[in-house]
From Swiss-Prot:
This protein may be expected to contain an N-terminal transit peptide but none has been predicted. This is Glutamyl-tRNA(Gln) amidotransferase subunit A, chloroplastic/mitochondrial. It comes from Vitis vinifera (Grape). Residues 21-52 are annotated as: Disordered. It comes from the Eukaryota. The lineage of its organism: Eukaryota, Viridiplantae, Streptophyta, Embryophyta, Tracheophyta. Coiled coil: none annotated. Its EC number is 6.3.5.7. Keywords: ATP-binding, Chloroplast, Ligase, Mitochondrion, Nucleotide-binding, Plastid, Protein biosynthesis.
Length: 546
């Protein structure tokens, strides 16, 4: 028996349009197991959540430590945790040399970049010069790009140290990181569970403190769902906010490079470093890039209702029967805390919500069938020896691509074929327009929208690997945001039962186009409601420095 959220009739049914509903959100305390210091609380901490980036910078400038010492500490933590997590496909060999260069700058009293000495993980579908960039696929196993992606170049220009390339589902096609051709990444909160996907390696690396921040990509939720599963902050920017140059194309009208951090401040600092117009990407926007963290303040220094007047819409369809009840309780609790901060929280309906998931998979698969045609063993990709050209193409792709990639290429080719284009691809584009209109209407009445980031907490490795429908259904909370091209921030809001210390739940905040600044400001205030705000996984409880 399929659960409601797995049932195709649930995914395809037309949602009724509900009028806005205003009610008080009383938290029915979810199962916040162990580590009570992480519970959402009405008693704010005395200081805001610590920014690791700002702490590193302050320690370097005031010479309390050196970049080399920090690098050695981080590499040691990575060596201790990596055998259990498998976050990285490859680790840079130049880390210590880059750290030495930062120390030399300090010795010469030169100005440091905003990311100086900060360890940054990079998802392995984002190109890095002179480092492997595999896309998680055998067909690119030996590929070393001659250039950096624009986002990577900007990280390096700001002094960031790329520690390595993180694991992912092949070409970003998956929700568990089990689809990698090289290894399966585990969730630091429970190593028997998935970290989410497709940016599972990037999320797990930040959660396990193997790096300070990381870059991922988000086509249908690949930053936000892993952030929820791993208890970290994840940001999907507006489409066009961050250059896609150097990102391996999956679905070009949906792909976005996003950010992970252990705090909203670190995530905002990373976004500021990589955002902005790039002439190498024709979809890049010329919208001004604000200083996302310049207005961040401790909640103790603000008025008692720091978010007074903010209109928040809780998306009703995201609390449906197919969503884990403990997850719903956590989100309702988060809505209650937003009200305590001064927000007006109202239930809103997105009439086209349930149509987004099937439309997304038609559009994404169609675009991938075109984008991945370049990997033929001649222009790109590993080549398999063959006597005839057609055999070379076929054998190279058959042996180079994994099963999920093949399935999506076939699905996309079918949807674009003569006789089926109007029935599938064209209708999916029409649904996309409906989704965009639904969000526009909702955001005309609300400043931000909120929902769960995923319908469940992290599940066991292998649990859904052979059930594509169930795995696809897990994206229902996130794909609509990509169809609309809007920004969304995910941050931890509590725990539910599972694993040795509970499993994190993520709250998704959705904003208007290019309004990342508002999302980050609200997120920064909200996270200070979490006592001590240290979502430290059990993996790090055994004496490994955090």
């Amino acid at each position: 028996m399929l659960s409601t959220v797995q049932n195709p009739r649930f995914l395809l049914r037309q949602c009724r349009h509900f009028p806005p509903k205003r009610r008080r959100f009383h938290s029915s305390t979810p199962l916040f197991l162990s580590q009570p210091q992480t519970l959402a609380s009405t008693d704010p901490p005395s200081s805001p959540p610590q920014s690791q980036i700002l702490t590193i910078r302050d320690n370097l400038i005031n010479r309390r430590t050196t970049a080399v010492e920090l690098a050695q500490l981080s590499l040691n933590r990575l060596r201790l945790t990596e055998p259990q997590i498998n976050s990285f496909i490859s680790v840079s060999e130049t880390v210590l040399r880059e750290a030495e260069e930062i120390d030399a700058k300090i010795a010469r009293n030169e100005e440091l970049g905003p990311l100086a000495g900060v360890f940054v993980g990079v998802k392995d579908n984002i190109c890095t010069a002179d480092m492997p960039s595999t896309g998680g696929s055998r067909i690119l196993e030996n590929y070393r790009p001659p250039f950096d992606a624009t986002a990577v170049k900007r990280v390096k220009d700001c002094g960031g140290i790329v520690v390595g390339k993180t694991n992912l589902d092949e070409f970003g096609m998956g929700s568990t990181t089990e689809g990698s051709a090289f290894q399966v990444t585990a969730n630091p909160w429970d190593v028997s569970r998935v970290p989410g996907g497709s940016s599972g390696g990037s999320a797990a690396a930040v959660s396990a403190r193997q790096c300070v921040v990381s870059l991922g990509s988000d086509t249908g939720g690949s930053v936000r769902q892993p952030a929820s599963f791993c208890g970290v902050v994840g940001l999907k920017p507006t489409y066009g906010r961050v250059s896609r140059f150097g990102l391996m194309a999956y679905a070009s009208s949906l792909d976005v490079i996003g950010c992970f951090g252990s705090s909203v401040a670190d995530t905002g600092i990373l976004l500021h470093a990589i955002a902005g117009y790039d002439g190498l990407d024709s979809t890049s926007s010329k919208h001004e890039v604000p200083n996302y963290t310049s207005q961040f303040m401790s909640i103790s220094s603000l008025e008692s209702k720091p978010l007074k007047g903010l209109r928040v819409g809780l998306i009703r369809e995201t609390l449906d029967d197919g969503v884990d009840k403990a997850v719903v309780s956590s989100i309702v609790g988060a809505a209650s805390h937003l009200e305590e901060l001064g927000c007006t929280v109202t239930e809103v309906s997105l009439p086209s919500f349930s149509l987004g998931l099937p439309a997304y998979y038609i559009l994404a698969s169609s675009e991938s069938s075109s984008n991945l045609s370049r990997y033929d063993g001649v222009r790109y990709g590993s080549q398999v020896g063959a006597d005839r050209l057609n055999s070379l193409y076929g054998d190279s792709r058959a042996k180079g691509f994994g099963p999920e990639v093949k399935m999506r290429i076939l699905t996309g080719t079918y949807a674009l074929s003569a006789g089926y284009y109007d029935a599938y691809y064209k209708r999916a584009q029409q649904v996309r327009t409906l989704v965009q209109k639904s969000f526009k209407a909702a955001l005309n009445e609300n400043d931000i929208l909120i929902s769960p980031a995923a319908p469940s907490p992290a599940y066991s490795i292998g649990e859904k690997k052979n059930d594509p429908l169930a795995m696809y259904a897990g994206d229902i909370m996130t794909v609509n945001v990509n169809l609309a091209g809007l920004p969304a921030l995910v941050l931890p809001c509590g725990f539910v039962e599972g694993g040795p210390a509970g499993l994190p739940v993520g709250l998704q905040m959705i904003g208007a186009a290019f309004d990342e600044e508002k999302l980050l400001k609200v997120g920064h205030i909200f996270e200070q409601m979490l006592k001590g705000y240290k979502f430290i996984p059990p993996l790090l409880a055994d004496g490994i420095a955090c």
